Amino acid sequence: MRVGVERAVQGLALAGGLILLALVGMTVLSSLGALGLKGAQAGWLPQSLAIGPYKAGYEIVELALPGIIFAMIPLVQLRHAHARVELLRGRGAPTLDVVWQIVAAAMFALIAWRIGLGMAGKMRSGTETFLLALPVWWGYSACLPGAWGAAIVAAYNAVRLARA
C-alpha cells in the first residue's frame, strides 16, 4: 500500500511542478515581450520585437498557483516534512504523532470540503476573471485533488503509525 500511496502523491507533486515550470516559462516570455515593447518604443530595439506582454498573464498565475501548492502538500504530509516544533518528545511521542496525524486529516478534510463548497458557489454564480473571462471555479477545482489527497495521506499516516 505504501508504494501505491507514494506513487500517487509523487505523481500529483510532479504534475504541480510541471505546471509551475509552465507558469515560469509563460512569465519569462511575457517579461521578455514587455521588454521588447519598451525597447522598441525607446528606439533601441527593432519594431519586430515589440510584441508586448501576455494579456493578463497574472490571472492565469492567480488561478493556477493555489492548485500547485496544494499538489505538493500530500507528498510533504507523507514524508512528515512540515515544519515541526518538538514538544513533549519522550515516551508518549508515538501516540502524540498519531493524534497529530488525525488532527491533520480532519483539518485537510475540512479545508477540502470548504474548497468544494466555494467551487460550487463560483460555478453557480458564473464568476469569471476580469480580463480573460476564465471561470474562477477552475482555480478551486485545481486545489481539490491536493486537499483531499493530503487528508487521505494524513489518515493513512495515522493508521500506519498506530500499527507501528
Annotated model-derived regions:
Residues M1-A164:
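Alpha-helical transmembrane segments and membrane-interface helix-loop junctions
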